[in-house]
Amino acid sequence: MTEKNAYAQSGVDVEAGYEVVERIKKHVARTERAGVMGALGGFGGMFDLSKTGVKEPVLISGTDGVGTKLMLAIKYDKHDTIGQDCVAMCVNDIIAAGAEPLYFLDYIATGKNEPAKLEQVVAGVAEGCVQAGAALIGGETAEMPGMYGEDDYDLAGFAVGIAEKSQIIDGSKVSEGDVLLGLASSGIHSNGYSLVRRVFADYEGEAILPELEGKALKEVLLEPTRIYVKAVLPLVKENLVNGIAHITGGGFIENVPRMFSEELAAEIWEEKVPVLPIFKALETYGEIKHDEMFEIFNMGIGMMLAVKAENVARVKELLDEPVYEIGRIIKKEDKSVIIK
């Protein structure tokens, strides 16, 4: 028995791994940007920070996955957008600190290496990188028979960005009276899916629920997470934003306080929040308490900005999209987030 045959008999297909690398090269090439050094396949991805032109550079990093949304991608055999979700979860976190994404690395583990499927996943990662302006400079695809079922895989990513030291957003600039501006989400994004899957467990993916405005359930559930980098970065560059909250796991209640100091609180005006149909459906079909919805989901606002009142007009001008004035920063008396 040759070593190659022995490895194949253990469930690892080396040739399929080589095929994946060849398939993804064209997708990786789409993401190239100034600063990238070396070619795909090296032991480490390289990036030349001097190409960024940042005078006092601070590197800001983030890592994340897509949770059990991945189980729906597998269930519905739709793998071309889940990679964008992974990128979004990472780069939206670092833009909240004022960072411009520079590069991204992905990690895929699977029970059986299926090149066509994994190409779709990486194509989605590349699309997310293009939207974020980040280079896909490396990654790992691990075939792990026995650890995962043949049809299963897991996906995680790691993003690194850069900011001028003077433009870091860390909550210290937010003050009483700042206006809270909300940017629309594209849907559920990539958190809360253990609950989402339970609520819709008895519905087919093709189901058309009246609340979802004619869209198939699986289309709504797998809607890619919006990437906010290109919308928000110009605001950071002009020093127009005091605080940013990426509304992910924990909803408004957990994430909004992360952008200001402990003596402050956020007053949210619920009637100003553009609640998406999917959240109304989740609340109804899942019999979820209304208040709890704001503790789990983004409710239609995927990113929140704290902005001085005199800067609101300029922020709206630069964003060139619907911007929702959904609250203000107040002195904290009890709770960190008050939804009125």
Curated annotation (Swiss-Prot):
One GO biological process from the UniProt record? 'de novo' IMP biosynthetic process
* Domain of life, per lineage: Bacteria
Q: What is its EC number?
A: 6.3.3.1
Subcellular locations according to the entry: Cytoplasm
**Keyword annotations for this protein?**
ATP-binding, Cytoplasm, Ligase, Nucleotide-binding, Purine biosynthesis
Listed pathway(s):
Purine metabolism; IMP biosynthesis via de novo pathway; 5-amino-1-(5-phospho-D-ribosyl)imidazole from N(2)-formyl-N(1)-(5-phospho-D-ribosyl)glycinamide: step 2/2
Q: Any idea which GO molecular function terms this record carries?
A: ATP binding; phosphoribosylamine-glycine ligase activity; phosphoribosylformylglycinamidine cyclo-ligase activity
Catalysed reactions, semicolon-separated: 2-formamido-N(1)-(5-O-phospho-beta-D-ribosyl)acetamidine + ATP = 5-amino-1-(5-phospho-beta-D-ribosyl)imidazole + ADP + phosphate + H(+)
Q: Which cysteines are joined by disulfide bonds?
A: none
A Pfam short name: AIRS
PANTHER family recorded: TRIFUNCTIONAL PURINE BIOSYNTHETIC PROTEIN ADENOSINE-3, TRIFUNCTIONAL PURINE BIOSYNTHETIC PROTEIN ADENOSINE-3-RELATED
Q: What is this protein called?
A: Phosphoribosylformylglycinamidine cyclo-ligase
Supply the source organism for this entry: Streptococcus uberis (strain ATCC BAA-854 / 0140J)
